[in-house]
Amino acid sequence: MRVNTDAVLLGAWMEIPMQDNISMLDIGTGTGVIALMAAQRVSNKLSGVKIDAVEIDKDACKDAELNFSNAPWDGLHPNLYNTSIQDFTEWEPQKKYDLIFSNPPYFIDSLKNPNQAKSVARHSDTLSQGDLLLCVGKLLKPGGKFAVVLPKTEGEELLRKIDFLFNSAIGKQICVLSAKRVCKVKTTERKEPKRYLMEFEYNVATEREN
């Protein structure tokens, strides 16, 4: 599988907490690009950093494993799990992260690619937005961040879901995600945005100021 622009954009744009002993999770790591970019950004700056990466596709896992093993940053090789994020969340309920990032599947109602690996990587029937949000909510620490990249249509859909869940949780003293940053990426200045880079924070929902 080739490196795609979405992964590089997210890996460069997302904010990493610059403190020792942080934990990060890459959901749907693919070839491991974003996890490796995260490792590079904190290498020689932080200590005790842990990076986990989850990937459901076996062939992609082989690529990621090779890339992780060749990473030049001692002690910062991501831990790879060949499973779905749904199963990972069920098997590892004690794991909590300061930062979760993902370049998830996004084609909802389109014909599948005959190439199975590309189909798994692109189609959301392997990971719906609802499942993604549920798993992220279970795995984030309070105050933790979730960074994600999606095409415009799917990005706007995710923002609507997050806003609905946030408003529904106000006054209930439960942690939910709320949007903190959104970057709309255009291929040229005059064109409509093609990608949404989004960052959410996991905290108790409170009334927003007008």
Task: Show which residues each predicted segment covers.
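Conserved Class I SAM-dependent methyltransferase catalytic core
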Residues: V3, T126-P193
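Residue-level signal for inorganic ion chemistry
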Residues: L10, N103, L132, F200
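Domain-wide signal for the mature, well-folded portions of proteins, strongly enriched
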Residues: G30, D87, R122-T126, D131-C135, ...
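SAM/dcSAM-binding transferase cores
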Residues: K191-N210
